[in-house]
Amino acid sequence: MALASCLNLVFSKNTFALYTPTLSASVNQTNLQVNGNSVINSTDKTTEIPFNFTVNTNNRTGYTATLSSETENTALTNTSSAAGAKIDSISTDLSLNNLPNNTWGYKFGVSTNYAPIPALSTPAQILQTAGKTNGNESNQLSIGMKLADNLESGNYTNKLILSFVSNPYTMRAVMTNGPDFNARVGKLDVNTGFASWDSSVAMMTNIRYVKKSTIRPSVSQAIINIEDSDSDYEILAWFDAASGTVYYYTDAEKIELNKNSSYLFHNFSGLQEMDMQNFDGKNIENMRDFFANCSNLASVNFAGFNTGKVTDMTGMFYANFVLKNLDLSSFDTSNVVYMNDMFSGMRELVNLNLSSFNTGKVEIMVNMFYDVRKIKNLNVSNFDTRNVKKTRNMFANMLELESLDISNFDTSKVEDMAYMFSQDHKIKTLNFGNLNTSRVTTMEYMFQNMWALESLDVSSFDTSNVTNMKDMFNGVTKITTLILKLSCGMTKQRKLLITTPSRERYF
C-alpha cells in the first residue's frame, strides 16, 4: 500500500488598493498539511480542509477575490517521484464523494460541490462585493481530495494564490442631505423674509439663482461646505447678494444629490430659475417638497435627470405659483409610492408633460393636481393606478380643465374619492369607463360645483361601502343627463341629494 506521508499547500496573497480606499486581507492558515496515510485508511478515503480569509476595506464599491494556482500546473506534485506521481485537479464540479481517485479541488462558502483548481492564467473569481466591509469580514474556503491505495509515497505540494483587489472606484462629490442643505444655504441670505401664514417660517426671498462656478471662491468670501460626509470632494457654496446668486463649486464634473433630498429648495421663494443638469439624481430616494413654496420659480430644466430610485415625490412642486411649463418626460417614476400634492397650487401651469410616468407603485394621489387652475388639457392615459388607495382632491379646483379621460384608471383599491373633481368648472363630460368603486367609503363633494357638466354616467359605481355622500352633486347646475344605478346598494348612506336645474331627488 502506498503511503503519502505529507501534503503541503503553501498560500500567498496579493493585495491591491486602488485610489484612496484601503484594503487589508489575511488567511488564517498559510501552510496546510494533510496526512495522506490517514486519508487512505479512512472509510471513504476523502478529506476536507477548511480555512478562512478575512478582508477589511473602506472601498465603497467593494473588492474582488480570486483564486489560482501559482503556475499553470494545477496538480499536487511529488517532486521526488521518478515516475512523476501527482494528485490531479478535478476537471468539473463534483461532490466530495464523487471525486475520482487521487484528485483534489476547492469550494467556497456553503457550496456543496468542489470546483477544479484554476491555473494562473485563468483565475477563478470566488467573491465580488459591492460595498465596504463592516469591519473585518471572514469567508471560508475548503480544499477537498480523494486518495487511493496506489498513490506513491512522498510529499505532494503546490501553491495557491488568493488575490484581493479593490473594485474600480470613481471619486464623487455628494451633496449633504436636503434639510441640511436647506438650512445651511438658507442662512447665506441674511435678509430673509417670513411666510405670510407663519411669521416664524423663514422664506429665502433674496436667493434668485443657484449656479455652478468654474473657479474656486476667494478666501475673502463667506464660504460654507455643503458636501455629505461620504463625499470625496468638497462642495463649496457662497452668496453674491448683488446678483442674488448662490454659487457652488466642486472639482467633480457633477454633484450626486443625496438619497434624502427632501426639502432641498423648500421655501426658496425668490428662486427664479433652476438648471438640474449639473446634478445627478441616480441615488435619490426622497424628493418630498423639493421645490415646495418656490413661488417665483419660472423655469426649471430636468433634461436627463435620473429619478429611478425615488419613492417619495410628495409636494415636489407645491405652490409653484408662476411656473407655466414643466417637462418631466425624463422622469423615471417606477418606484414612486407617494405623489400627493405633487403639483398642488401650480396656478399658472399650462403645459405639463408626464408622458414617461410609470405610476404602478403609487398608493397616494391626494391633491396631486389640486388648484392647477389654468391647464386646459391633462393627459393621464399612461397612468397605472392599480395600487392607488386615495384620490381625494386629485383633480379638484382645476378651473380651466375642459376634459378629462380616466377610463384607463384601475381604482379597485381606492378608498377615498372625496372632492375628486370638485370645482372643475369647465368640464362638460367625464369619461370614467368602468370605474371600480367597490372599496370607496367616502364620495362627499365628489362632483361639487362642476358648473359645465352636462352629462354623467355613474351607473358602474358600486357604492355598497360608501358611508359619506354629502353634497356629492351639489352645484352641478347644468346637468341634463345623470345615469345612476338605483340598485347600487347605498345601504350605508341615508340619503343622496342630487341638485339639477329642474328637480331635486332623493335616492
Question: Can you name each region flagged by the protein language model?
Answer:
Residues 169-507:
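Negatively charged
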Residues 1-6, 113, 173-175:
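Short intrinsically disordered, low-complexity coil segments enriched in acidic
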Residues 14-170:
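Signature of Gram-negative chaperone-usher
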